[in-house]
Amino acid sequence: MEVFTTKKQPLTTVWKMHTAGDAQWYPAQVPGTVYTDLLRNGQMEDPFWKDNEYRALDLMEKDYEYETAFEGTEAQEGERQWLRFEGLDTICDIYLNEEKIGNTYNMHRTWEFDVTGKVKAGENILRVYFHSPLEYIKEAYEKQPTHGSEDAMDGFVHIRKAHCMFGWDWGAHLPDAGIFRPVYLLTMTEGRIDSVYIRQEHEEGKVTLKFEVSRNPKEDLRKEIPVGKEADGYTYEVTVTAPDGTVITAKDTPEDLVIEQPELWWPNGVGAQPLYEVTVTMAKDGQPVDSWTRKIGLRTMTMDIHPDEWGESFAH
């Protein structure tokens, strides 16, 4: 069993939430949202029933807090620690042990905060304070009136949040909030994998997977460096496990890997959906540092735009 120098501790601990300023706390589920937690705790009705939408909308005039306690260890010499939020919706402040470590303003990205020297041995308290999205867009609209969809709420164009939440000609006004993706504590002594991009080239009887792997140095997770493009001791290997259990491995920082006689993925109703498991393992001077695993389907997509009596078969 490989031991990686990058440790990823999921904060799937017991969370609680409440309306900011309210003494009553409720059990929360993370990942989740304010609406799903209020529904689960009997604090709101189904927003899609009758005119409950309007009462659900009023709830988002308020601020909400989420809190959890987790067991941590202090960073050792040479280690860096980061809190990673894979999805926060949307305007919020982050506190670790009552110290503000950052704020967010965009639900369409991942957020990471350096907490080296801030994580204690033993119990740590993590708190996320969500500001009302309705108050945010109201203030932004008053400063700069800008319109979007006629059926959406004024000011929605000023916030980096799923715009469908603010209403559409077909949609309800339900601007939810919350920690909608996982939270992790990262501890590392070296860099870690930042991204893996896989391209597929299909030929008769085979598929070639082409890899682009980038890493983050431990000092700055915002910086991306292609693995294998610098003489810094970083390499990676790729392992692909076929649906039948066959394993293909390519070492020494491969740019591509060939799968012979592939099992192709087809849309529902057209064929089967076999998945291949791809694992990229990064090492520094031969020591495993980090790994990345995903399941992918081998497929291509083209648009049928042959001429027809109206122009082309695909409307675009």
Q: Which stretches of residues belong to each language-model region?
A:
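Secreted/periplasmic carbohydrate-active enzymes, especially glycoside hydrolases
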Residues: 1-316
